[in-house]
């Protein structure tokens, strides 16, 4: 698959937009390149957006600009139809109706669960409203009975639920989550990412979720924005991004796909590991290029005359990952069920 220009599928927004970014750019004074460059996207009310990319790609900087923690260089940020940042407009963070969940929980150690959740309500509600909203938020994240505990008496997963409840309590229009699961162990992460999606969906609150974990982004979001070096490489549904990557970077980063040199012969693409037939809607004019083959699409069979050698095999529980070497020395990876057990 040759490098392709960034493809932005036209997403039909039937619900009002809760977040709109138009040509947003940010460059720090000490840097020669932009941290965020010309990013435009729209998030519909009630949807969850994952900002996905490697470290340093600009996703956290973009999140901080949406929150109001970083000024932008150029472009426009609008929340619920209201411009909150542009060349002539600056709305401070506390007036943006945005909740924030941080990677390190950011709880007050001297306050109880109830007091932490209620903290952001002190200036916007009376005592009766504070009590009602605090109880509602604690119930939303299923922490009833732990109201009087301190953060030091909670597990990591429980602390992150408190942080989420605190963000939910003021009933913001949008919640921003900056890699909220990265400090948790695997089982807690899997459970909590399901709960975060369920809580936000049931509350009808939109969310922007920053992560460098591909599986996490695909599982939790309605839209995925893949970023590289400050630019938006692709915006689409998880299925679109996975099955129709817009560039080689997206294919490599999101699916860990193999790329195999290929030459066209009629309707077939010939490679050193076999021939591939592409469906008509994926035909291209070029006579040669790199063919993208996902790890799960490589089918393995034992063949004593084959030129592909199994170099190693990793057991991953539900599947095997085979490390392969071709005659030319290229390294490939294939994933199979454990029912396929090659030597």
Residue map of PLM features:
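The feature captures the beta-strand-to-loop junction immediately N-terminal to the Walker
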Residues: 52-54
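Helix-to-loop junction immediately C-terminal to a conserved catalytic motif
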Residues: 67
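Non-catalytic connector elements of ABC transporters
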Residues: 257, 267-343
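ABC ATPase nucleotide-binding domain helices that frame the ATP-binding cleft
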Residues: 60-63, 162
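Conserved ABC transporter NBD signature motif
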Residues: 75-86
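ABC ATPase nucleotide-binding domains
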Residues: 93, 97-99, 103, 107-249
């Amino acid at each position: 698959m040759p490098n392709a220009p960034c493809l932005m599928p036209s997403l039909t927004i039937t619900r009002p937009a809760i977040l709109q970014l138009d040509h947003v750019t940010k460059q720090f004074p000490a840097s020669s390149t932009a941290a965020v460059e010309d990013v435009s996207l729209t998030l519909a009310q009630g949807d969850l957006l994952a900002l996905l990319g490697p470290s340093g790609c600009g996703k956290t900087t973009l999140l901080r600009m949406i929150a109001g923690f970083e000024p932008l260089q150029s472009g426009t940020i609008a929340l619920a139809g209201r411009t909150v940042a542009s060349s002539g407009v600056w709305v401070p963070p506390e007036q943006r109706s945005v909740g924030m969940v941080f990677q390190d929980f950011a709880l007050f150690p001297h306050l109880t669960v109830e007091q932490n959740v209620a903290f952001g309500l002190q200036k916007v509600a009376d005592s009766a409203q504070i009590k009602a909203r605090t109880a509602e938020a604690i119930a939303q994240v299923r922490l009833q009975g732990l109201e009087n505990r301190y953060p030091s008496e909670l597990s990591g997963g429980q602390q992150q639920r408190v942080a989420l409840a605190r963000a939910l309590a003021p009933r913001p229009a949008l919640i921003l989550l900056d890699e909220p699961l990265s400090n948790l162990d695997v089982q807690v992460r899997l459970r909590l990412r399901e709960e975060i999606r369920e809580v936000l969906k049931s509350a009808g609150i939109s969310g922007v979720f920053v992560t460098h974990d591909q599986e996490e982004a695909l599982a939790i979001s309605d839209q995925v924005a893949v970023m590289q070096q400050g630019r938006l490489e692709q915006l689409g549904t998880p299925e679109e991004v996975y099955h129709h990557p817009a560039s080689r970077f997206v294919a490599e980063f999101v699916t860990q796909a193999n790329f195999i040199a290929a030459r066209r012969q009629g309707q077939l693409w010939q490679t050193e590991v076999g021939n591939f037939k592409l469906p008509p809607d994926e035909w291209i004019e070029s006579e040669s290029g790199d063919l993208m083959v996902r790890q799960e699409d490589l089918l393995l069979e034992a063949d004593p005359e084959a030129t592909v050698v199994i170099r190693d095999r990793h057991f991953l529980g539900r599947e095997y990952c085979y490390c392969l070497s071709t005659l030319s020395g290229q390294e490939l990876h294939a994933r199979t069920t454990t029912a396929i057990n090659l030597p």
